Amino acid sequence: MPDAYVESLGKMIAILVNYKPGSITLENITRLCQTMGLESFVDQVSANISRLSIASKIIVIDIDYEVTDGKVIDVKLVLASNFDKFDYFNGEANILHRSLTTYSDLHEFHHNLKFLTLLDACSSIDIESNVSQFDLFEYYSMLPQYMQSYLDDNGAQLTVQTNLNDRFGIYLLDHSEKKVAKLTFAATQDPNQRYYEYKYSSETKEWINQSAESYTTGITLVFELLGDPPTYLPKDSLPPEHPDEGFTSASASELQRRFAFKCQNPRVTLVNDFTVDVYPASTFQLLNDNICLCFDILRRQKWWHTVLYPISQLLLHQGQDSAVGDAPAPAAQPPLHRRRSSNKGCRRASAAESATLGDENMHQLTLTEIMNKSVIPEDDAMMDDRIELYVNENYVYLGTQEGCSFYNDPIERWEAFVESLRQMLT
């Protein structure tokens, strides 16, 4: 009962801190440390400068505060371990210092402090003997190098950068420096869940765990897809630790969330060839060797934003000759059309009927004119020109002429196919 009470109280405090983190003062920083269970004490460095020291099992943060002006002038982080190259910078910028000097409240500093305390709590280090089974501070600092080598070896044209926007995190950027994905750490629901140290080997091109003793518990690596619109992925392509509980049952909310291709373009016959449903997915728990799924997830993200999503938008476009609000075109095969007989009821026109046509000054067609004249209605002709488009979670085909595949084709082929389809429909 006491444990449940303490846990509930901790959640309430976290909600209040997130809602209103408070302005950046020495007193508010001290209170924040108290709510997080961190030790803190203040020393008077000089007449105008106070130093707040924040300490836990491994981390020690010294914050120098100018009392007269009421602002932070310096922040330093020291680790009580044998690793002294922990990355808390973005280039030359100290993100702990920036989170206390660039913003109007403690929100960013609180976010960074939670990250540090998580690594502190979950690192498997014996401080007295200075023996480390799994130092998460060292692993976080080495992971960007592992990830860059992994992406380069798989041909992903992405650049790895750390601690952007004054927040801890490992970011993946494309050629235009747009943030595509982010790696960070988070606590697991099961505090006994093991997380092993996996390093990337450029020789074997694999993620390997070099020691069965190199593990910790209660933490996991989290891979987050960034950007808009959201990415939809096939259910069977997600890692087992995907945190979205909506995938466990076919609930009503799940049915509403899955993506459905719709066709309103009268020039297209859509053949929905999906074998699984696709759902919005952005966050993935990459426990242990599942870190090797990063490239597959990134390729799925690229496939969605390059092929499937643009095609879904093209199908919603009704064409230049269709008014907004027209009913969507039926996704059915066009009917077969026969040349209509010029005879009525298979009988010959009588002389009287011929005379009547002449008397009414109506043009009498010759046999040659009848044979050369198109007798297929304009609407039917348009249906004969419909494009048959097959869409699947792994491929897209335009009739039997051309297509592109998630597994077999390069990204350039994806882009060329979508552009070809766009030109046909616009």
UniProtKB/Swiss-Prot annotation:
Signal peptide: none annotated. InterPro entries: Mediator_Med1. Coiled coil: none annotated. GO terms for cellular component: core mediator complex; mediator complex. It is found in: Nucleus. Its main location: nucleus. One of its GO terms (molecular function) is transcription coregulator activity. Residues 324-356 are annotated as: Disordered. Keywords: Activator, Nucleus, Transcription, Transcription regulation. Residues 336-347 have a biased composition (Basic residues). The keyword Transcription regulation applies. GO terms for biological process: negative regulation of transcription by RNA polymerase II; positive regulation of transcription elongation by RNA polymerase II; positive regulation of transcription initiation by RNA polymerase II; RNA polymerase II preinitiation complex assembly. It comes from the Eukaryota. Component of the Mediator complex, a coactivator involved in the regulated transcription of nearly all RNA polymerase II-dependent genes. Mediator functions as a bridge to convey information from gene-specific regulatory proteins to the basal RNA polymerase II transcription machinery. Mediator is recruited to promoters by direct interactions with regulatory proteins and serves as a scaffold for the assembly of a functional preinitiation complex with RNA polymerase II and the general transcription factors. Component of the Mediator complex. Belongs to the Mediator complex subunit 1 family. This is Mediator of RNA polymerase II transcription subunit 1. It comes from Eremothecium gossypii (strain ATCC 10895 / CBS 109.51 / FGSC 9923 / NRRL Y-1056).
